[in-house]
């Protein structure tokens, strides 16, 4: 059963993905599938590389934290190591994000600027994506 021919807007995203999962799709977008598999390969390779410790730097994702918290995150005198459980949790999150962006595209939504780097007032960060013209992060 094809997806309903409603205009694709971000507010129909979940409904459209559910429809795709329930009814399937006759032909998959092969370019989208190749991109998804490429992202999966990169994530597995990054996950299984030797862990070099966290890089301490100011990122856009930290906006909103107190100055004191930011100072301690960057200047913490106690060395912290990511546990295997925490690394697994981040890996799972990366895989889930890639899967959902893949499904959004297969459901007919326009997905752009995946993991695009942005710089605001000299601070670097990445956006997850823009779906149907709406920043999704």
What residue ranges belong to the model's regions?
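Metal-dependent nuclease catalytic cores that hydrolyze phosphodiester bonds in DNA/RNA
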Residues: 1-135
């Amino acid at each position: 059963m094809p997806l309903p021919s409603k205009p694709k807007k971000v507010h129909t995203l979940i409904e459209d993905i559910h429809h795709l999962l329930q009814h399937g799709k006759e032909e998959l977008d092969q370019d989208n599938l190749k991109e998804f598999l490429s992202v999966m390969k990169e994530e597995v390779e990054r996950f299984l590389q030797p862990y070099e410790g966290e890089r301490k730097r100011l990122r856009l994702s930290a906006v909103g934290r107190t100055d004191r918290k930011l100072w301690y995150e960057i200047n913490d005198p106690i060395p912290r190591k990511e546990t295997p459980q925490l690394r697994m949790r981040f890996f799972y999150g990366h895989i889930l994000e890639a899967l959902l962006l893949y499904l959004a595209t297969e459901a007919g939504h326009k997905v752009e600027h995946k993991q695009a780097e942005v710089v605001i007032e000299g601070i670097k960060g990445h956006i997850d994506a823009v779906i149907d013209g709406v920043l999704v992060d």
